C-alpha cells in the first residue's frame, strides 16, 4: 500500500485532521502527516501560497532545501488563503500534478502563475464528509453554532447561544468524525469556520457564514474562492456589532444546491490521485 505523505498543520482542528482520518477511510489508504519538504500530496486546506517562492530571505533559504529534497508533489482540493502572493510566482517544486483545486479563483491564479491550463474539478475535499459518515444522520438540533477553533471563547458566541433554542455548540477541536456527524445532525448551521460550512454543504444543511470580528487570518479570500466553485458570491453575516442572524434568513439566503454538491462529490472522489 502506498503511503500518502500529506502536508497539513499538526493542530487539533477538524478542517485539518480530515486530511488523515477521512481520507484514510474513504480511499482505503495510509496517510502520514508531513511537511512541504517531504510530502507527496497537498490536499484539503489553503496551502497553495506556500508552494511559491517567498520574497523573505530566510523563507527562501528554507524553500531551497525543500526544492532540493522534494520535486514531485500532487495537488488535490487545495487553494490560496490570500488574494495576492507574498513573493514570486515561481514554484518551489519542479513538478506538480494538479488533480483538483479549491475554486475558480484558485484555478485562474494557478493558470496565470504557471502558464498551464487546469481542466480539473473544483471544490473542497470536505464535501466528501457525508460519504465518510455513510449516510444522512437523523436531525437532533435546530441550529448548530460553529466558531472557528481560534474563536471558541469569543464573547459573541455566548450571545449566539442565548439567541436560539435547541442549539448545538460544535467544537472543531473534538474528534473529527464526531464533529462531522454532529454537523449532519443539525437543521441549520451558522459558522465562522469555512470547514464548518463545507461539512454542512456535504449534508445539504442550509448554512450561513458569520464573522465575529475582522481579525481572522486570510481576510475572507478562501471563502470567496470556495463559493466561486459553485458560481456564487460570498456574503457573510457580520455579528461583530451584536447582530444575530434570524432562522428564516439562514434558510432563505442559502443557495448551494444539493445537486451541485453531489456532482462535486463524485468528481472530487474520482479525481483523487493514485500514487
Language-model segments: residues:
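Active-site anion-handling motifs in enzyme catalytic cores
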Residues: 1-275
Amino acid at each position: 500500500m502506498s503511503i500518502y505523505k500529506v502536508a497539513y498543520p499538526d493542530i487539533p482542528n477538524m478542517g485539518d485532521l480530515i486530511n488523515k482520518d477521512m481520507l484514510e477511510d474513504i480511499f482505503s489508504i495510509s496517510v502520514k502527516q508531513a511537511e512541504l519538504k517531504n510530502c507527496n500530496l497537498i490536499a484539503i486546506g489553503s496551502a497553495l501560497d506556500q508552494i511559491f517562492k517567498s520574497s523573505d530571505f530566510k523563507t527562501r533559504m528554507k524553500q531551497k532545501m525543500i526544492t532540493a529534497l522534494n520535486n514531485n508533489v500532487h495537488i488535490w482540493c487545495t487553494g490560496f488563503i490570500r488574494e495576492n502572493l507574498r513573493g514570486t510566482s515561481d514554484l518551489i517544486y519542479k513538478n506538480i500534478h494538479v488533480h483538483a483545486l479549491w475554486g475558480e479563483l484558485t484555478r485562474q491564479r494557478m493558470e496565470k502563475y504557471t502558464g498551464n491550463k487546469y481542466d480539473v474539478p473544483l471544490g473542497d475535499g470536505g464535501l466528501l464528509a457525508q460519504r465518510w459518515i455513510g449516510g444522512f444522520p437523523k436531525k437532533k438540533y435546530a441550529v448548530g453554532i460553529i466558531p472557528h477553533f481560534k474563536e471558541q471563547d469569543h464573547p459573541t458566541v455566548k450571545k449566539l447561544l442565548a439567541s436560539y433554542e435547541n442549539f448545538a455548540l460544535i467544537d472543531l477541536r473534538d474528534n473529527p468524525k464526531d464533529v462531522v456527524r454532529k454537523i449532519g445532525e443539525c437543521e441549520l448551521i451558522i459558522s465562522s469556520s469555512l470547514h464548518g460550512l463545507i461539512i454542512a454543504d456535504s449534508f445539504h444543511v442550509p448554512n450561513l457564514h458569520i464573522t465575529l470580528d475582522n481579525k481572522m487570518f486570510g481576510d475572507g479570500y478562501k471563502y470567496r474562492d470556495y463559493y466561486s466553485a459553485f458560481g456564487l458570491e460570498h456574503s457573510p453575516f457580520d455579528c461583530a456589532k451584536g447582530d444575530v442572524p434570524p432562522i428564516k434568513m439562514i434558510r432563505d439566503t442559502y443557495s448551494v444546491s444539493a445537486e451541485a454538491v453531489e456532482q462535486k462529490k463524485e468528481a472530487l472522489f474520482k479525481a483523487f490521485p493514485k500514487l
